[in-house]
Amino acid sequence: VNAVTLGGSLYWVDMVGNRTAPVIFGPRRVVLLAGRNKIVDTQADAERRVQQIAGPKNVARHTGFRTPCAVTGLCADCNSPQRICNSRVWLERCYPAGL
């Protein structure tokens, strides 16, 4: 999870969806842990957190990536083939409820 809103929405940004798909279509029960640093007020704050903090930190772990955020540390909403933020997922609630 890249961010969690105070309203309970979970937000992920991923390169190919390998971190989001298992949560959506995977096992019957999934346990997610998120640190206090990922809690934000609104969905706009969640998107801002990913662009300004999580995205640049994540791409920095991948040596050899030359996206604008890897070079400058700031999201440029690029169109690079190495772009790590291709899929965006908002999880509002689970269905059926209680699982």
Model-predicted regions and their roles:
Residues 1-99:
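Conserved phosphate- and dinucleotide-binding cores of soluble alpha/beta proteins
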